[in-house]
């Protein structure tokens, strides 16, 4: 089972392939991450490693968070995440993981929080068709009927209506690694990833 790392979205740009075609790419700052905890099949009923990312000032963490890290002489780390693995004997507490675990041409999945767009109507949120814009119509961007009458006398759960758009945990799959900079821990992926510049992402 492949492990993952945490990273930060730096932004997007484009590169040109051998044929001169422009390829949109996303630049990520990945790691370095520290192994902060190990879960074993015998003790926890599953094998996993917990990694920490982004060193911060100690006063920005709670005492339980600091204690969890200080037990293993680890620096204050803001973000913790667990990844399931087949076996944990190849990892050690306080081991440092960086972008070198990825390979050129590897297919990865990236998870993060999508850009929040606030309260949105049905046209923007669900791609509803607009009503007539002329000839006396007053139904331009209204959602229309949201259900039947006295039977069932309720609006069904999951009905597409206006509401908050974006700001959800999203995973983008099948992204190709097109460049690696191991000296600066920079990963370049073909395509786009969730969130805005500065978002914390999980690359797996």
From Swiss-Prot:
This is Large ribosomal subunit protein uL3c. Part of the 50S ribosomal subunit. It is found in: Plastid, Chloroplast. It comes from Guillardia theta (Cryptophyte). One of the primary rRNA binding proteins, it binds directly near the 3'-end of the 23S rRNA, where it nucleates assembly of the 50S subunit. Residues 126-155 are annotated as: Disordered. One of its GO terms (biological process) is translation. Belongs to the universal ribosomal protein uL3 family.
């Amino acid at each position: 089972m492949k492990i993952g790392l945490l990273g930060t979205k730096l932004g997007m740009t484009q590169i040109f392939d051998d044929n001169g075609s422009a390829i949109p790419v996303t630049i990520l700052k990945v790691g370095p991450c520290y192994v902060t905890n190990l879960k074993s099949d015998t003790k926890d009923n599953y094998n996993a490693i917990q990694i920490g990312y982004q060193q911060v000032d100690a006063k920005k963490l709670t005492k339980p968070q600091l204690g969890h890290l200080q037990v293993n002489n680890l620096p204050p780390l803001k973000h913790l995440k667990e990844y399931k693995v087949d076996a944990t004997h190849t990892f050690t507490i306080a081991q440092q993981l960086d972008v070198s675990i990825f390979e050129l041409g590897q297919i990865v999945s990236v998870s993060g929080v999508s850009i929040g767009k606030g309260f949105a109507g049905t046209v923007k949120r669900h791609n509803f068709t607009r009503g007539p814009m002329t000839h006396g119509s007053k139904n331009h961007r209204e959602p229309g009927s949201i259900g039947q009458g006295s039977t069932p006398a309720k609006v069904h759960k999951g009905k597409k209506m206006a509401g908050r758009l974006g700001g959800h945990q999203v995973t983008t799959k099948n992204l190709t690694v097109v460049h690696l900079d191991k000296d600066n821990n920079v990963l370049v992926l073909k395509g786009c990833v969730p969130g805005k510049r500065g978002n914390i992402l999980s690359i797996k």
